[in-house]
């Protein structure tokens, strides 16, 4: 499946990534993307940037190296109440918010606790996608969470980095099963490289392979085309981004 948007990438501001936003944009162009989301870790992750880093993203240009930039964050799920580590005042300055579990922030617990946290973060209405759900340390009720995501128009991320099998070991088959459940329920899918170095931005080959293998319809993959992605943002209640209107053509 052709994928024109990468919705998960990091700069050196995350504390354990190694490239600048401009370097990421250059790689995005080289790898054939139309747009990408910059999604550094929110502040609870060790080494992550502070409040003003996210609040000030309005100064970022809408295009770098001819590639559209979406202003975003990878927020941490903090607890079973589904709270995230991002002040509400930041939300108007961002286009895209992922919520993810990370061991340094949310200690792995049990299936029921993880499920409750995911249901609550979806129902909270502040996040657009759930990141790298395949991690076996954070087992959850696939059907309950994906059904909730479908009802609230929250996308399910297919994470290319996870599918390499080097991080979040044990995730690959779980990612395929999550995709199968999501297909049956009719969820929206997004795709992210989870790049921590610029050369990986736009590397979505394994995500594309999974989507094709499971038989996901491209109309349910919001990263298949810029127009689909922008339509999804508006479905989520975000206002139109006038500077990106030309990408709908």
Swiss-Prot record:
The keyword Hydrolase applies. Binds 3 Zn(2+) ions per subunit. CDD domains: PHP_HisPPase_Ycdx_like. One of its GO terms (biological process) is bacterial-type flagellum-dependent swarming motility. Zn(2+) 3 binds at residues 74, 102, 132. It comes from Vibrio vulnificus (strain CMCP6). One of its GO terms (molecular function) is phosphatase activity. This is Probable phosphatase VV2_1469.
């Amino acid at each position: 499946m052709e994928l024109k948007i990468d919705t998960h990438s990091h700069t050196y501001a995350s504390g354990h990534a190694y490239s600048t936003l401009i370097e990421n944009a250059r790689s995005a162009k080289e790898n054939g993307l139309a747009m990408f989301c910059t999604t550094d870790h929110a502040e609870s992750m060790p080494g992550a940037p502070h409040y003003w880093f996210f609040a000030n993203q309005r100064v970022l240009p809408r295009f770098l190296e001819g590639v559209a930039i979406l202003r975003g964050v990878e927020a941490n799920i903090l607890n079973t109440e589904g709270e995230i580590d991002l002040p509400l005042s930041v939300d108007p300055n961002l286009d895209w918010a992922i919520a993810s579990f990370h061991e340094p922030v949310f200690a792995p617990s049990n299936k029921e606790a993880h499920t409750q946290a995911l249901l609550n973060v979806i129902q909270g209405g502040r996040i657009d996608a759930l990141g790298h759900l395949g991690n076996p340390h954070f087992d959850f009720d696939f059907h309950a969470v994906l059904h909730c995501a479908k009802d609230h128009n929250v996308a399910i991320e297919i994470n290319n980095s996870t599918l390499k099998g080097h991080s979040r070991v044990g995730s690959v088959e779980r990612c395929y099963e999550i995709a199968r459940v999501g297909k049956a329920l009719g969820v929206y899918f997004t795709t992210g490289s989870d790049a921590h170095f610029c050369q990986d931005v736009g590397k979505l080959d394994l995500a594309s392979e999974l989507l094709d293998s499971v038989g996901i319809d491209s109309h349910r993959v919001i990263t298949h085309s810029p127009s689909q992605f922008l339509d999804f943002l508006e479905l989520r209640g975000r206002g139109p981004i006038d500077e990106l209107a030309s990408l709908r053509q």
